[in-house]
Amino acid sequence: MNALQEDTPPGPSTVFRPPTSSRPLETPHCREIRIGIAGITITLSLCGCANARAPTLRSATADNSESTGFKNVPDLRTDQPKPPSKKRSCDPSEYRVSELKESLITTTPSRPRTAKRRIRL
């Protein structure tokens, strides 16, 4: 009836056509893409495609690469220790000196001091 027989192989989902030439077509609209996955290099020739830049953080050619497909890629780990930062001093006398220097630099006129009168009871 409508049941599949066990000896019938499923139909192919993709069709493989071997390349007619290993040389890429030499037209200005043809691009070659190489993808390296676990020691296997896949080369795709895309003809009739437009140029589009897609910058990534980790991208490199897979030539002579055996394990990862990346070659001469900078290390992007963030768990490296940071260089020591310059510590600020907490000495109050240094703060007062810098405060006095700032007051000498300012050009705004200060208001004249007035004598305080104290009332004694």
From Swiss-Prot:
Q: What induces it?
A: VP1 and VP2 are detected 12 hours post infection, while VP3 only after 24 hours.
Q: Which domain of life is it from?
A: Viruses
User: What segment(s) does the record annotate as region Disordered?
Assistant: 1-28, 57-121
Location relative to the cell: Host nucleus
Annotated keywords: Apoptosis, Early protein, Host nucleus, Host-virus interaction, Inhibition of host mitotic exit by virus, Modulation of host cell cycle by virus
The processes (GO biological process) annotated in the record are: symbiont-mediated activation of host apoptosis; symbiont-mediated perturbation of host exit from mitosis
Pfam families the record matches: CAV_VP3 (PF04771)
Q: From the record, give the transmembrane residue ranges.
A: none
An example GO CC term for this entry is:
host cell nucleus
- Where is the sequence biased in composition, kind Polar residues? 58-70
Q: What is its main location?
A: host cell
Where is the sequence biased in composition, kind Basic and acidic residues? 88-102
| Protein role | May act as transcriptional regulator. Induces apoptosis in infected cells. Element of infectious replication cycle.
Q: Which family does it belong to?
A: Belongs to the gyrovirus apoptin family.
- Name the UniProt record assigns to this protein: Apoptin
Lineage at the top is: Viruses, Viruses incertae sedis, Anelloviridae, Gyrovirus, Gyrovirus chickenanemia
